[in-house]
Design a protein with these regions (language model features):
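A conserved FAD-binding loop/helix module that cradles the flavin
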Residues: 132, 259-287
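Rossmann-like dinucleotide-binding cores of NAD(P)H-dependent redox enzymes
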Residues: 11, 15-45, 52, 133-180
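FAD-site-proximal beta/loop scaffold in flavoenzymes
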Residues: 91-117, 201-265
Length: 287
């Protein structure tokens, strides 16, 4: 939008390709071939847009440098961190993040190079958990189980997506939380779970446990905003605070998408935030 108004734009991206979640985070079974690449090529064809890849904010370039070199800065940082289960052995090779596997799959030139477990457990209740489970089932896993600590209606994944997973052979178990990774010499053999229940609005463990055998375990319990970058604008609830025009508390800096307070995990919402911020930037620069 700003390029169409005649501004010279520079995009910095930490990855080797543009496209963000559309390129790296959407399961392959949901995406058309090279759709993200085609979309970015269309945007770049507008003209006046330079892009610099493998450029990580806070490592390869600082926020202060961007402020000095450009009239306005828009931060679309997404959520690069992941939540952890806080279980013993979690930092070993026995468990992986679903987002990492989906990224590897999307960028793989040969699917035969990807590990595919025979029995797979996915821990979580959102769209990433569903995508991970359906994707690896389609790749050939014999048994895939999603385990979520609350009930079906509490899952952030829609009922339709849950049903789609089940139609693809994925088992979904509710009211269970992981209590122990079953590991033998860095090799995962399964996960021990404890049944949960809702008591007076609080999730409590019942003390009764069970185990699911698995040779691959994936974590899909949400992502977090990595806020270790120097001189970031003010945060609230762990994300960047913005006004209705997506302007931050720091003059000359706007932000949008998942990295801002109340940001939604939706591409269309991030695009809308970018449009609103672009108009705000233009209005401020011409005033």
């Amino acid at each position: 939008r700003l390029a169409m108004k005649g501004y010279s734009i520079t995009i910095f991206d930490s990855k080797k390709k543009l496209g963000g979640l559309n390129e790296y985070g959407i399961a392959a079974y949901k995406s058309l071939e090279n759709f993200a690449e085609r979309e970015t090529k269309f945007v770049l064809s507008i003209g006046g847009i330079e892009h610099k890849l493998n450029s990580t904010l806070g490592k390869d370039i600082t926020l202060e440098e961007l402020q000095n070199d450009y009239d306005a800065v828009f931060l679309g940082l997404g959520l690069s961190g992941v939540n952890h289960l806080r279980l013993e052995g979690e930092n070993s090779e026995a468990i992986d993040d679903a987002v990492n596997y989906i990224e590897d799959l999307r960028q793989s030139q040969n699917l035969a190079d990807l590990p595919v477990g025979r029995k797979v457990v996915v821990i979580g209740g959102g769209m990433t958990a569903i995508d991970m489970a359906v994707q690896i089932k389609k790749l050939g896993s014999e048994e895939v189980t999603i385990v979520y600590r609350r009930g079906q209606k509490d899952m952030s994944a829609s009922i339709e997506e849950q049903q789609n997973a089940q139609n693809n052979g994925v088992l979904i178990r509710h009211w269970s939380k992981p209590s122990k990774l079953l590991i033998n010499e860095k090799t995962v053999n399964g996960v021990e779970f404890e049944y949960t229940e809702n008591k007076n609005g609080k999730l409590v463990a019942t003390g009764e446990k069970f185990s699911i055998k698995a040779d691959m375990v994936f974590r899909a319990i949400g992502q977090t905003f990595e806020s270790s970058i120097d001189n970031l604008p003010k945060l609230e609830n762990g994300r960047i605070l913005v006004d209705n025009n997506y302007k931050t508390t720091v003059s000359g800096i706007w932000a949008g998408g998942d990295c801002v307070k109340d940001g939604e995990d939706l591409t269309v919402s991030a695009v809308e935030a970018g449009k609103i911020a672009a108009n705000s930037i233009h209005n401020e620069l011409v005033s």
